[in-house]
């Protein structure tokens, strides 16, 4: 299906990828665990598993090969908590190598990464067997997908709206970029 049909039918991109309607899916690291689960449950669900692999993210000129995108997922302690010390202990554990290895064992990518966590991820059930997929785990730099800003949510709404307009051919790429720039600048002042 084209983008408009996919959007109006409610077909999620993971479904389009899983059923072969999309040849590739530009997704975050979390999608690996999604695909591993899909394949593990495929037989019981009466569908075929997907033979897939992963590759390194394309990088712009000037960025080292192996560069990728990342985002911030925050953990916090409620100021009104009666268990602040226990919460702080948990947060410290979350940032530890032990926690990174535990998360990697589930096929997910921890915030603290190392050669060891990459080896663990590559050894999880359902990880693609090809060398390119293993090589894709080796990154050289991680850049924020979106700069930290209290306006990030408003800006993302603009980006998504203009993306939809471009993908449904309601406007050209140049028009969409111009609209994004104008609307984002209005928010940033």
Predicted regions: what is each one?
Residues 1, 21, 35-42, 94-98, ...:
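Sec/Tat-exported extracytoplasmic proteins
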Residues 1-41, 85, 176:
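Extracytoplasmic ligand-binding clamshell segments of periplasmic binding protein
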Residues 8, 14-19, 58-61, 77, ...:
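A residue-level marker of the well-folded mature domains of exported/periplasmic proteins
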Residues 14, 18, 26, 78, ...:
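Non-transmembrane alpha-helical segments in soluble domains
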Residues 40-108:
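Extracytoplasmic/periplasmic substrate-recognition and gating elements
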Residues 43-47, 61-62, 102, 161, ...:
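Conserved N-terminal structural module of periplasmic/extracytoplasmic solute-binding proteins
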Residues 52-56, 105-161, 165:
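Long, aromatic- and glycine/proline-rich binding clefts that accommodate carbohydrate-like moieties
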Residues 63-70, 80-87, 148-156, 170-173, ...:
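Solvent-exposed, acidic/flexible segments
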């Amino acid at each position: 299906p084209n983008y408009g049909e996919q959007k109006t039918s409610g077909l999620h991109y993971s479904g389009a990828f899983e059923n072969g309607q999309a040849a590739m899916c530009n997704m975050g690291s979390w999608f690996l665990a999604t695909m591993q689960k899909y394949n593990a449950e495929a037989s019981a669900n009466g569908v075929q598993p997907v033979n897939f692999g992963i590759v390194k993210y394309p990088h712009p000129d000037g960025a080292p090969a192996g560069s990728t995108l990342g985002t911030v997922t925050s953990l916090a302690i409620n100021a009104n908590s009666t268990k602040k010390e226990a919460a702080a202990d948990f947060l410290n554990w979350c940032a530890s190598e032990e926690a990174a290895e535990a998360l990697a064992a589930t096929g997910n990518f921890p915030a603290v990464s190392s050669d060891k966590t990459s080896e663990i991820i590559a050894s999880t059930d359902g990880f693609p067997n090809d060398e390119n997929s293993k090589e894709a785990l080796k990154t050289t730099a991680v850049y924020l997908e979106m700069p930290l800003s209290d306006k990030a949510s408003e800006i993302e709404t603009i980006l998504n709206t203009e993306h939809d307009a471009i993908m449904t051919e309601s406007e050209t790429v140049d028009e969409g970029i111009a609209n994004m720039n104008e609307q984002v600048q209005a928010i940033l002042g």
